[in-house]
Amino acid sequence: MYKSNYDKYPATPMEGIVWKGWENICNQLKSSLSAESCVLVIECYQGVLHDELRDGFAGLHADCWIDTQSLFKPVNEIEQMTYPYVTDDRLFGFRTHLSYKDFFNTDKLASAREKIRSAQGLTVVYGHGAAWVAPEADCIVYVDMARWEIQMRSRRHEINGLGVENKAEGASYHYKRGYFVDWVVCDQLKKQLLSKADYWMDTHIAGEPKMITGDLLRKGLDKTAHQPFRVVPFFDPAPWGGQWMKRVCDLNPDQPNYGWCFDCVPEENSLYFNINGERFEMPSNNLVFYKTRDLLGGPVESRFGQP
């Protein structure tokens, strides 16, 4: 009988601490914030489950909580602003030049920043663009999300795009908005935070949050860039074929077929760290962003620049 040796869960082995569960995560964050008055930024990538995160971080017992969603421009303004990039075409669009500053209402932003400056105790700035709203934060937590999981959540109509309410839209339109607008905007800020975030979070499995230090994240990316590695493959049904992959890749035999296999697309695939036996997931794009020269070489970076 054929036995597949295909590794569906490749990972970089690491040693370090992983905080699991909301109680442990909140306790660690509170213990790291020793000052009487401090600002904690919780920056979120598009596609996170905000209801779960808000409930989970309630355990911080913040004295002042600012949700960046309340500072965004109205939905209709954001739709109008992003239309030239998203367009009406089902497939084609244009890569945006927008950044987070274009999404915020200037008056609300100024009021929020003044509130942050005058607040006492623990102030939490949560949501998309939180690190831009509070650039002088005492501690930065980044809640990441890989694009394959974003696509799965889009298919289940669980998430909205940046500043819009489009859960009911088809997954292809979600993907298009993400590709041309949302992910571009999120990645601009992420590139700045990869080198300085204090903590990094994996919430890809709902109800099972995990957190590591930013130092451990950067150590893992450096290690991965200097050794052979694989990104995490994913598979998807399609109208054609797919029986061969079931057998060779040890896939779910109950699915009708598998027509797609993505095994090296950094923009869409995940990267795993195996930290003392605990799997920690992130977008493999993080490696490309943080270790561009080490990963691709000097000539490639010099010719094409940062991704």
Give the positions of each predicted feature.
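ATP-dependent NMP and nucleoside kinases share a basic, alpha-helical "lid"
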Residues: 60, 110-163
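Short, intrinsically disordered, charge-balanced linker/junction segments flanking boundaries
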Residues: 299-307
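Short hydrophobic/aromatic beta-strand immediately N-terminal to the Walker A/P-loop
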Residues: 39-43
